[in-house]
Amino acid sequence: MIQTDAFECKYIIKGSIEYQIEKEIFTLHEGDTLFFDGRARHRLKNIGATEALILAFYLF
């Protein structure tokens, strides 16, 4: 798991992603957006059969 010193915004351009933030798991698909405090421990995993593409914003 990782942490950053920023708020993070992730937009799923293509594919399916599983995002774990602390103990909570979110399943994201094309067109979904996730916004969270990057100081929380988090990780992501590609759960689709194809490559995933994510646009990430870090707000310091």
Each predicted region: which residue ranges?
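Short histidine-centered beta-strand/loop micro-motifs
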Residues: M1-T4, K45-I47
